[in-house]
Structures are given as C-alpha cells and as structure tokens.
Regions:
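Amide-donor transfer/coupling interface in amidating biosynthetic enzymes
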Residues: 29-135
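Cysteine-nucleophile active-site neighborhood
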Residues: 1-49
C-alpha cells in the first residue's frame, strides 16, 4: 500500500523537482495542479489541496465497509489526472477530477492520507491487512 507521494512514485513520471522518472507500476504521469484554480461554483481553490474531500469509489475490495463519497484527508500539489485509466479505483474533485486511488494486482495506492482520516482511514488499513490481492 502506497500513500501520497508513494502513489506518485508508482507512476511513470512526475513533474516534481523538474521531472522524475518513477517506477512505472502504473502507466501515466503526475502533473502539478494549476496555480489559479476555481471550484464548481467559481470559488478560488488553494494549492496545495489541503483538507477533507470526498472520494468517489470504483468497486474494489479495499473499499469494504467504507461508504462511497467518504471524506479523506489530502495534502498535495500534484495529481494523477487520467481518471479514465483502468487502474483508477477512486477519484476526487478539486477544480477538476483526479485519481485518489489506484490499484493493480496486489498494489493499492492512495493520494490521500489514511493515517489522518480517522475511522475510514483505519478501516482502509484493516482492509489492506485482510485483502488477498484479488479484485
């Protein structure tokens, strides 16, 4: 299980630090949030994205016991924006949609911080310990 930057290094490339070739477990690139972003109602959004936000789930055993659209805690300035990739099992809306969770084989990665996300975060860790790697 990978968390935050841990998820980012599992992709192919990230823009952070003038560009980093990563591990390539997941296809795709990590891009920086635009400096000037607005929400759906036109309100300005700050970067880094910091705070609680809903995660829209795609069916996966790691979400067992966690309702769809549960709020998790985020702190990040970079994102995996290809929300249509086969590996995306959770998305979040912050100015635009980005991947909040990726999964492939026995690997599960999240952009948010389960350790700061109270009961849902604890449940996610329980699910990881119980997960047999099948989807």
């Amino acid at each position: 299980m990978a968390v935050c930057v841990g998820m980012q290094i599992l992709t192919e490339f990230g823009e952070e630090s003038s560009g980093i070739h990563a591990l390539g477990v997941f296809q795709g690139h990590i891009t920086q949030f635009p400096r000037a972003m607005t929400g759906r109602a036109g309100e300005p959004l700050k970067v880094p994205h910091m705070g609680w936000n809903e995660v829209i789930q795609v069916a996966h055993p790691m979400w067992e016991g966690i309702p769809d659209r549960t709020r998790f805690y985020f702190v990040h300035s970079y994102r995996y924006a290809d929300v249509h990739a086969d590996c995306v099992v959770g998305t979040c809306d912050y100015g635009s949609f980005f991947a909040a969770a990726l999964a492939r084989d026995r690997v599960f990665a999240v952009q948010f911080h389960p350790e700061k996300s109270h009961d849902p975060g604890i449940q996610l860790y329980r699910n990881f310990l119980a997960w047999d790697g099948t989807c």
